[in-house]
């Protein structure tokens, strides 16, 4: 903004004594004042703020002169030592000449007159070697993306003849050729030609080779793992005998067969005997014979209506904990009846467990069989009825009269 000129009015006049004292003090410390000049004609200064990119300063811009009355300016005091440029410019005139108030302002420049200042230094600008805008170089640039990919893969700069004489690329190509010639002179036997790029076939071959190596490593690791396994190794003779696998049917017996409690019912008693599943029933027969005080030949074991062989085992018979075996004690026979003609007849009661096998001579009446059954089953005094093939027996019949044979069944109802 322009600063308006200040007009100084006349000082207030005091008494004579004070004015004389002030003049005396001014005479001692100041230089003699310049004589006051009458009203002068000075040009009207136009105050303008100027903006410039340079460091030059212009004192003032003078417009059309006009007469402006200026008030009387007092003579300035002795110039003091100041670093300001305004004070130095004001003190340069002669002591007797009147001083003019000078105000420095910046010059407003036209945009076309603004000086061009480089942004980069000379060193930075020399390193920026840009490709010049030349039509010969533009012809070398491919227009299709496939050609661009081929050009980037090759990575070779344009030829030296296609470049303009002042191009930096030409200097670089010349230096590169000189280096290659030096290398050829130093190592004449060494082949410094660029290596050919691997084709897709070579890449696939390398891929298959890598897969083969991985398979070999996996196979070796598996072999090593089998060698370190805690399993027992068989001899090579046993391993290479036959490649066939033979399946053997049937259950394999465990090393330690388990024990279970076998229930044996004899008359009104129930005997619990711990036996092994692989143990034959002959041990049960011997135990029951010693328990009853009879000969083992007189002990008969029955499971339902089936006579059990002494050589059978609980595993083969599939006996469980809930199954019950009946033990029958056969009656003792006389010497004349111990012949090969004796009949072994089965007598079955109303209940399933009331079954007894009795040996009887063909000449003996059936009354003997009935009384023997009543004693063995503890049913003495009970009214029982015996039937053979639906015919009720009175006890007076003989086996030969009825045509009985060994293994025939006589039913008992009571």
Curated annotation (Swiss-Prot):
Gene3D superfamilies named among the record's database cross-references: Phosphatidylinositol 3-kinase Catalytic Subunit, Chain A, domain 1
UniProt PTM comment: Methylation at the N-terminus by PRMT1 modulates interaction with the NFAT complex and results in augmented cytokine production.
One GO-annotated biological process of the protein: positive regulation of transcription by RNA polymerase II
Amino acid composition bias (Low complexity), ranges on this chain: 68-79, 90-100
Subcellular localization: Nucleus; Cytoplasm
Basic residues composition bias: residue spans: 7-33
Coiled coil regions in record: 170-229
Domain Ubiquitin-like as annotated: residue spans: 343-414
UniProt keyword terms in alphabetical order: Coiled coil, Cytoplasm, Isopeptide bond, Methylation, Nucleus, Phosphoprotein, Ubl conjugation
Residues annotated with Phosphoserine modification: 52, 54, 83, 85, 87, 121, 193, 199, 309, 364, 385
Disordered, as annotated region: 1-42, 63-118, 139-208
InterPro entries the UniProt entry points to: NFATC2-Int_DNA_Repair (IPR052324), Rad60/SUMO-like_dom (IPR022617), Ubiquitin-like_dom (IPR000626), Ubiquitin-like_domsf (IPR029071)
Quaternary structure annotation from Swiss-Prot or TrEMBL: Interacts with NFATC2, TRAF1, TRAF2 and PRMT1. Interacts with UBE2I/UBC9.
Function in brief: In T-helper 2 (Th2) cells, regulates the magnitude of NFAT-driven transcription of a specific subset of cytokine genes, including IL3, IL4, IL5 and IL13, but not IL2. Recruits PRMT1 to the IL4 promoter; this leads to enhancement of histone H4 'Arg-3'-methylation and facilitates subsequent histone acetylation at the IL4 locus, thus promotes robust cytokine expression. Down-regulates formation of poly-SUMO chains by UBE2I/UBC9.
Identification of the protein by name: NFATC2-interacting protein
Species in which this protein is naturally found: Rattus norvegicus (Rat)
